C-alpha cells in the first residue's frame, strides 16, 4: 500500500471515530437533557399547590385553650404550598408559637393530609403577675383564662421557676395538713422567701430553713389567734422566735425574739 493510500485510510478511520464520538456525546447530552427536563417537570408538578393541594389537617391531642380558629390562622400561609413542598418544620414551628401549645408534631399522610398532634401547656401557677408557670417549672406567656384564677401566684427570677414551684409544693403541703392554704409564694432576687396565706397573713421566711420556720408559725399560731386583733404579717427570720405585725397599721411586736432577722 502506497503512502498516499495509507493517509486516505487513516483519515477515513479518523472521520469514522469522530462520528462515533460525537454521536455518543450527542446521545448522552440528549439523555441528560431529558432527565433534567423531566426532573424540572416533576419538581413543578410536586410543588404545584393546585395539582397536589393539602386538603385536610387532622388535629389530635387534648385541647382546652387552643381553638381551631387559632390553628387555622397560624397555618393559613403555609397551607398554600403543595402536599410535597409544605415545610413540615415550619408548620411545627408555627404551631408551637401559639401561646398555649407546648409541643407539636407534624407528619404527612398520603394522599393530601397533614396529621398534627398537639400537647398544650399545663399551667401550674401565675408567674410574676403577667405570665404562667407550667408543671415543669417553665415560664410561658399566654392570655388569662377565668377558670385558672384559682391557681397560686408565684414570683421570682425567671431562671428559678422550677425551684419556686418545688418550694410551693413543699410549703403548701405542710400548711394544708395544718388547716392553712398558701395563696402566693415569692422569691426575691436576694433569694429570700415570702409567703401569703389564704387568710391574707404574710410570712417572711428569709433565705434559710423555710420549712422549719413554717412549722414554727404553725406551732405559735394558736397563741397568736387568741389575741383580739388581726394578724397582718409574721416575720420568721430568726433562729428562735418571731415578730408579728398587727392589723392595718403593720406595727410589729416581737415574740420570743432574741436574734437578728436573716
Swiss-Prot record:
InterPro entries: Cell_div_FtsQ/DivIB_C, FtsQ, FtsQ_C_sf, POTRA, POTRA_FtsQ_type. It is found in: Cell inner membrane. Residues 52-121 form the POTRA domain. One of its GO terms (biological process) is FtsZ-dependent cytokinesis. One of its GO terms (cellular component) is cell division site. Keywords: Cell cycle, Cell division, Cell inner membrane, Cell membrane, Membrane, Transmembrane, Transmembrane helix. The chain crosses the membrane at residues 21-41. The keyword Secreted does not apply. The keyword Cell cycle applies. It is a single-pass type II membrane protein. It holds the Pfam family POTRA_1. Residues 42-262 are periplasmic. Residues 1-20 are cytoplasmic. Belongs to the FtsQ/DivIB family. FtsQ subfamily. Part of a complex composed of FtsB, FtsL and FtsQ. HAMAP family: FtsQ_subfam. Essential cell division protein. May link together the upstream cell division proteins, which are predominantly cytoplasmic, with the downstream cell division proteins, which are predominantly periplasmic. May control correct divisome assembly. This is Cell division protein FtsQ. It comes from Shewanella oneidensis (strain ATCC 700550 / JCM 31522 / CIP 106686 / LMG 19005 / NCIMB 14063 / MR-1). The lineage of its organism: Bacteria, Pseudomonadati, Pseudomonadota, Gammaproteobacteria, Alteromonadales.
Amino acid at each position: 500500500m502506497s503512502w498516499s493510500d495509507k493517509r486516505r485510510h487513516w483519515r477515513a478511520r479518523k472521520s469514522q471515530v469522530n462520528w462515533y464520538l460525537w454521536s455518543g456525546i450527542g446521545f448522552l447530552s440528549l439523555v441528560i437533557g431529558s432527565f433534567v427536563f423531566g426532573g424540572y417537570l416533576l419538581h413543578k408538578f410536586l410543588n404545584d399547590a393546585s395539582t397536589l393541594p393539602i386538603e385536610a389537617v387532622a388535629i389530635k391531642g387534648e385541647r382546652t385553650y387552643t381553638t381551631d380558629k387559632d390553628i387555622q390562622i397560624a397555618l393559613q400561609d403555609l397551607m398554600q404550598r403543595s402536599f410535597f413542598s409544605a415545610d413540615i418544620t415550619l408548620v411545627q414551628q408555627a404551631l408551637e408559637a401559639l401561646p398555649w401549645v407546648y409541643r407539636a408534631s407534624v407528619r404527612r399522610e398520603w394522599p393530601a393530609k397533614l396529621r398534627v398532634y398537639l400537647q398544650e401547656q399545663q399551667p401550674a401557677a401565675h408567674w410574676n403577675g403577667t405570665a404562667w408557670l407550667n408543671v415543669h417549672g417553665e415560664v410561658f406567656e399566654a392570655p388569662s383564662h377565668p377558670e385558672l384564677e384559682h391557681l397560686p401566684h408565684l414570683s421570682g427570677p425567671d431562671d428559678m421557676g422550677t425551684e419556686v414551684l418545688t418550694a410551693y409544693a413543699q410549703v403548701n403541703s405542710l400548711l394544708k395538713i395544718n388547716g392553712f392554704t398558701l395563696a402566693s409564694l415569692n422569691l426575691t432576687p436576694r433569694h429570700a422567701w415570702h409567703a401569703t396565706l389564704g387568710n391574707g397573713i404574710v410570712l417572711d421566711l428569709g433565705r434559710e430553713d423555710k420549712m422549719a420556720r413554717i412549722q414554727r408559725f404553725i406551732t405559735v399560731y394558736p397563741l397568736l389567734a387568741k389575741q383580739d386583733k388581726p394578724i397582718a404579717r409574721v416575720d420568721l427570720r430568726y433562729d428562735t422566735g418571731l415578730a408579728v405585725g398587727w392589723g392595718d397599721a403593720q406595727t410589729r411586736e416581737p415574740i420570743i425574739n432574741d436574734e437578728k432577722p436573716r
